[in-house]
Amino acid sequence: MFTLKKPLLVLLFLGTVSLSLCEQERAADDDEGEVIEEEVKRGFMDTAKNVAKNVAVTLIDKLRCKVTGGC
């Protein structure tokens, strides 16, 4: 019976350490995911702003051409 306890304790210890390492890696991956989502949101908002600016500039140029008649 004593000869079986040591290997079982070693397996339990190694399993606990392995589980602990997996949880740390999973937590680190979750943190990186949040950063990536923020970057994607920020990138989308920047793109939307740039599109809005380009549309506004184009409309202003067309209005200026119609008002002055010199395009």
Curated annotation (Swiss-Prot):
GO (cellular component) term, any one: extracellular region
Localization in the cell: Secreted
Keywords assigned: Amphibian defense peptide, Antibiotic, Antimicrobial, Antioxidant, Cleavage on pair of basic residues, Cytolysis, Disulfide bond, Hemolysis, Secreted, Signal
Chief localisation class: secreted
Tissue expr: Expressed by the skin glands.
InterPro entries: Antimicrobial_frog_2 (IPR012521), Frog_antimicrobial_propeptide (IPR004275)
One GO MF term attached to the UniProt entry: antioxidant activity
Cysteine pairs bridged by disulfides in the record: C65-C71
GO biological process, one term: hemolysis in another organism
Signal sequence residues: 1-22
Proregion span(s): 23-40
UniProt KW Disulfide bond keyword: yes
Family: Belongs to the frog skin active peptide (FSAP) family. Brevinin subfamily.
Role of this protein: Displays broad-spectrum antibacterial activity against a range of Gram-positive and Gram-negative bacteria. Has low hemolytic activity, low cytotoxicity and low antioxidant activity.
Full protein name: Palustrin-2AJ1
Lineage, opening ranks: Eukaryota, Metazoa, Chordata, Craniata, Vertebrata
